[in-house]
Amino acid sequence: MIQTTFPDRAVMAELVAKMLWEIKAVHFNAAQPYKLASGMASPVYIDCRKLLSFPRIRSTVMDFAASTLLRDAGFEQFDCIAGGETAGIPFAALLADRLGLPMIYVRKQPKGHGRNAQIEGNMPEGSRVLVIEDLTTAGTSMFKFIDAVRAAGGIVDHGIALFFYDIFGQQRFTDGKVRLHHIATWRNMLAVAKAQKLFDDKTLEEVEAFLDAPLAWSGLNGGVSELSL
């Protein structure tokens, strides 16, 4: 099914934020912070995997992902979609179906030997591959999968995250020659939280303190205070 409608970016971002709140995918715990893939400590966590259990919401989010890519990257820019083990795999399958493309997945660790040891599925040499993750903060885990695809002979110029923390900008992606596409960010989540009063004042203050100075907050709460980008 090829996407043919292209909603406004702001509308998509707000709706995804509302849907994540609706399915209770937003978690807060400043006393026992969450540890992100980057090694950072965070008082908030978005469980995008919950989207899979809500078919209407899941379908809408994947429609938005397809619209975002077709509009911003183009209709004939990819030869296959790659999902990273584990969270990216189902979203890769859903997106590949919408775009009418083959799908592969990338293991966290090689299985066996050879340049394709981390790749499951058919990826011919020189394939233009889009890597998808459910969410990304600094790109740490996404680039592990991107590097594996490149090492196996694939070309990766684009990545997409359904949710992007957007607290460090995109320098890591610029340096890695990858254009990052995304649908919603933490600023969208906060806008909905404020409008619907989903956080009390103390919680809101803690979340904003983290978003304004994430590494400082992380360092004070058991996480890394600097990133190797």
UniProtKB/Swiss-Prot annotation:
Q: Which GO terms describe its molecular function?
A: magnesium ion binding; orotate phosphoribosyltransferase activity
Q: Which UniProt keywords apply?
A: Glycosyltransferase, Magnesium, Pyrimidine biosynthesis, Transferase
Which residues are noted in the entry as 5-phospho-alpha-D-ribose 1-diphosphate-binding?
R107, K108, K111, H113, E133, D134, L135, T136, T137, A138, G139, T140, S141
Q: Which Gene3D superfamilies match?
A: 3.40.50.2020
Q: What class of enzyme is it?
A: transferase
Domain of life (superkingdom)? Bacteria
Instruction: Enumerate the cofactors the protein uses.
Output: Mg(2+)
Record pathway: Pyrimidine metabolism; UMP biosynthesis via de novo pathway; UMP from orotate: step 1/2
- The UniProt record gives the binding positions of orotate as T137
Listed GO biological process terms: 'de novo' UMP biosynthetic process; pyrimidine nucleobase biosynthetic process
This protein's record includes keyword Magnesium: yes
The protein's Enzyme Commission number? 2.4.2.10
Q: Which Pfam families match?
A: Pribosyltran (PF00156)
- Which reactions are catalysed by this chain? orotidine 5'-phosphate + diphosphate = orotate + 5-phospho-alpha-D-ribose 1-diphosphate
What the protein does comes down to: Catalyzes the transfer of a ribosyl phosphate group from 5-phosphoribose 1-diphosphate to orotate, leading to the formation of orotidine monophosphate (OMP).
Q: Say which family it is in.
A: Belongs to the purine/pyrimidine phosphoribosyltransferase family. PyrE subfamily.
Q: How does it assemble?
A: Homodimer.
What is this protein's name?
Orotate phosphoribosyltransferase
Natural source organism: Rhizobium leguminosarum bv. trifolii (strain WSM2304)
- The gene name on file is pyrE
